[in-house]
Swiss-Prot record:
HAMAP family: UPF0597. One of its GO terms (molecular function) is L-cysteine desulfhydrase activity. It comes from Clostridium perfringens (strain SM101 / Type A). Belongs to the UPF0597 family. InterPro entries: Ser_deHydtase-like_asu (IPR005130), UPF0597 (IPR021144). This is UPF0597 protein CPR_0790. It comes from the Bacteria. One of its GO terms (biological process) is L-cysteine catabolic process to pyruvate. Pfam families: SDH_alpha.
Length: 427
């Protein structure tokens, strides 16, 4: 299991600049543009409903704009697909100008793809003499098809991502805990970079007027702040501020977890802040971050890569709560208590797309993470008498999957319809 856990962390904890769904669209568009011959006359983008939901209203770093069109146009303009999820970092003024010209031509068409896949991106570019198509499925960088002028350049048939996702079924909380506790520090110290990178964005979020300013307003000084200047509120503020900045288009990289920057924020910053508060060593922090990230990944396996439920508020915050519990001296039993408490608290938090108000969900999740860790370390847990919580923590986690599959079948459709109707009425 050691090698699987290390492989998973290195695959699932990776840097990205901006929200991952529009970046994945930019990545696909960039690949297609690199193959197309001639001047682009038409751009057709086919997306799963979950991708539309998460790309529709989120800020695109360095553009002052939001949404799918500018992200795709930038990918076409930049044509540096080798950068993958950092493709939107350090683009030039000329590249931005060209992207805006593409948007202004009104040649970008966006359509919903009728697919069972939560994450599906298809970008088709046409010129007078050429056509290029790229498909991404299942994970944000899993390119499954590249086609140019009816020639198949690459056809991966989505096998790679599915194989690794299947391995996540082997993850058990007890095994994750033991790995985090016993792994060689040299093998896991790379995970410290996730906290360093994300805390830099948090610092920027606390300084600037990003989004709703959820983080900065929690710790502002003045007559109208109802929050006290205590440790928990500082942790909540730091976490929310990173999301404030990221969702408002801050041009700084974020370390993602399981395909989401907000999940990366939610499972790293509260743990790092708690570690500093408790004066823990780098090794202790690394072990807590390994636990937090792997718990997040495990829960996300049952939620789905994109979900009607909030991955940051549920999976990421639960991971953080486990990491905090570990730093407080908790053992496996306390970790199990912590997970039961968190799922009791936050299991109904919906995902209504990627946008500035994600910072509110991060704040809520972080507050719950602290509260549930505090209960767990004192030996207090939700029990099988309480709602969807089971006697065994593995069953509690699996209940989230049952909830989504059986109870939330139409939630994504309903949310997306509300969002699209609102956009149509606001034109």
């Amino acid at each position: 299991m050691r090698e699987l856990y290390l492989k998973t962390l290195k695959k699932e904890v990776v840097p990205s600049e901006g929200c991952t769904e529009p970046i994945a669209i930019a990545y696909a568009a960039s690949i297609a543009a690199e193959y197309l011959k001639g001047e682009i006359k038409e751009v057709n983008i086919y997306l799963s409903k979950n991708v539309i939901k998460n790309a529709l209203g989120v800020g695109i770093p360095g553009t002052g704009g939001v949404g799918i069109e500018i992200a795709a146009a930038l990918g076409i303009s930049i044509q540096k697909s080798y950068k993958k999820l950092t493709i939107l970092s350090n683009f030039t003024e000329d590249e931005l100008k060209k992207a805006k010209e593409i948007v202004d031509k009104n040649i970008i068409n966006i359509k919903q793809k009728n697919t069972n896949k939560a994450l599906y991106i298809e970008v088709e570019l046409l010129s007078e003499t050429s056509k290029a198509k790229v498909i991404i499925e299942d994970t944000h960088t899993n390119v499954t098809l590249i086609e140019c002028d009816d020639e198949i350049i690459m056809d991966n048939n989505s096998e790679v991502s599915e194989d690794l996702e299947e391995d996540y079924n082997l993850f058990k909380i007890a095994d994750i805990y033991n790995f985090a506790k016993e792994a060689d520090f040299d093998d896991i110290k790379f995970i410290l970079e996730s906290a360093k990178m994300n805390e830099k964005v948090s610092e920027e979020g606390l300084k600037g007027d990003y989004g709703l300013q959820v983080g900065s307003k929690i710790i502002q000084k003045g007559n109208f702040n109802l929050f006290s200047n205590d440790a928990s509120n500082k942790i909540i503020a730091a976490s929310a501020a990173a999301s404030d900045a990221r969702m408002d288009g801050c041009a700084m990289p974020i370390m993602t977890t399981a395909g989401s920057g907000n999940q990366g924020i939610a499972c790293s910053i509260p743990v790092a802040q708690t570690s500093r508060l408790l004066d823990k060593s780098e090794e202790e922090l690394a072990r807590a971050l390994v636990l937090s990230n792997l718990v997040t990944i495990r829960i996300k396996k049952h939620m789905g890569r994109l979900s009607p439920l909030c991955g940051a508020g549920i999976a990421g915050a639960t991971g953080a709560s486990c990491g905090i519990t570990y730093l407080l001296g908790g053992d496996l039993e306390n970790i199990n208590y912590c997970i039961n408490n968190m799922i009791s608290d936050l299991s109904g938090m919906i995902c209504d797309g990627a946008k500035e108000t994600c910072a509110l969900k991060i704040a809520t999740g972080t507050n719950a993470a602290i509260q549930c860790a505090n209960l767990a370390i004192n030996g207090i847990s939700a029990t099988a008498n309480d709602g969807i919580v089971a006697k065994d923590v593995e069953e509690t986690i699996e209940s989230i999957e049952t909830l989504i599959q059986n109870g939330f079948k139409n939630v994504d459709d309903t949310i997306l319809n509300i969002m699209l109707e609102k956009k149509k009425n606001n034109k």
